């Protein structure tokens, strides 16, 4: 069954996103539902489809299960949905917050201290030179993979490496004296970048990666960087909240 839970007392058909291949073709009614307490969490089956994100929990959780196939991931990102879960003890969980935290590339904020770092030109930058090293460091830097809530496990790494291989995931590498100092990776669809993770092996390297990404996107008509969740660090660099409706308008206009 595709739909497992709906709002308490709901007796009318709910909705899910229907697709052909990886193309969004609209919202259709589905009679497959069962009542729960006071929220909706959908259990995905093997069909490449997602529930209407407006039906999710306040924290953005809309579904569990499914898989990390390229077709499902691309459909997810085209609708503002992304996977996030502890690979050690949880099934795949899918989120779509209604308040979207983004950075518009042309509005990236560079602090005075960070500008001084950049002016010293100690870093050099590449795009997609070593995606495998970047995602592996995002997983293991500072012992992240040892934490109970670690989310970037082998299955996720393999899924995003495949997206990279077929042209939908991008890495930014930051180098210092020929050594990898930091970087980030994410999904690229059209003129939008969906950030997944970043790391630093040297001070300021991940900030430098984000600034380089934003400036590169700004010079190539990039529309937005999806930061997924709000943090004070990203807020200080220009992150801001927009509505899901505005977010989707930007994605669909690309």
Task: For the regions a language model picked out, list residue spans one by one.
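Short hydrophobic targeting helices and cationic amphipathic motifs
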Residues: 3-5, 13-16, 30-33
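Local alpha-helix boundary/kink/capping signal
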Residues: 16-20, 89
């Amino acid at each position: 069954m595709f739909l497992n839970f709906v709002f308490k007392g709901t007796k009318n058909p709910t909705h899910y996103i229907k697709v052909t291949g990886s193309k969004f073709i609209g919202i259709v009614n589905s009679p497959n539902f069962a009542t729960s307490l006071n929220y909706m969490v959908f259990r995905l089956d093997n069909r490449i489809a997602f529930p209407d994100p407006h039906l999710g929990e306040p924290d953005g959780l809309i579904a569990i299960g499914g898989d990390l196939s390229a077709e499902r991931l691309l459909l997810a990102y085209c609708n503002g949905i992304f996977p996030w879960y502890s690979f050690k003890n949880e099934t795949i969980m899918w989120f779509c917050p209604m308040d979207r935290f983004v950075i518009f590339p042309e509005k990236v904020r560079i602090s005075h201290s960070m500008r001084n770092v950049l002016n010293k030109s100690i870093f050099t930058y590449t795009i997609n030179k070593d995606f495998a090293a970047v995602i592996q460091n995002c997983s293991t830097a500072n012992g992240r993979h040892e934490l109970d809530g670690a989310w970037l496990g082998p299955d996720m790494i393999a899924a995003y490496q495949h997206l990279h291989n077929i042209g939908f995931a991008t890495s930014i590498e930051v180098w210092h004296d020929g050594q990898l100092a930091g970087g980030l990776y994410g999904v690229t669809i059209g003129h939008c970048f969906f950030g997944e993770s970043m790391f630093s092996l040297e001070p300021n390297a991940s900030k430098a990666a984000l600034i380089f990404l934003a400036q590169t996107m700004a010079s190539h008509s990039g529309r937005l960087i999806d930061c997924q969740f709000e943090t004070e660090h990203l807020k200080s660099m220009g992150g801001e909240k927009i509505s899901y409706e505005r977010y989707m308008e930007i994605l669909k206009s690309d």
